[in-house]
């Protein structure tokens, strides 16, 4: 596309080693592939239907041996699909991160389903942006910044301000995967659909 990528991770993903409770469960839920990657004892869980948020989550799940059968770009869009598949009350195992939006579990519990949440990973915030990113930001050399989640956008904005780059933060083009991811930013363009393909389309069309 004619762009040079500059990486500055703002989150470090680490496993929690959480134990998986005994079922039975009707299906497994995942809003991030990390929930599956850090599942300490997947065992027979892979034989259960997997309901996932995001096409990428579903793709990685298949590569890991899971059986994704329902997926949507956002939790709110996944909820009606789950409601249409399962009679109440169904039992779900949600492999999740410690920092997450509660839309999925809240919506399922409100409908009378049982949701067991196992936090298999956590995302620790970085304490500073990468030196190369700070230098490029200060010099106005960043054409666009891509944001995949609300939390990572919040941390990026905070670290830029902490480095005295508030003005530069407001001048670059922010491209966000979703409206939620865009909310911490001074201004941002939002992908037509919440997936990487449409986010990169924003970059190509800017």
Predicted feature locations:
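Signature of uroporphyrinogen-III synthase
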Residues: 1-206
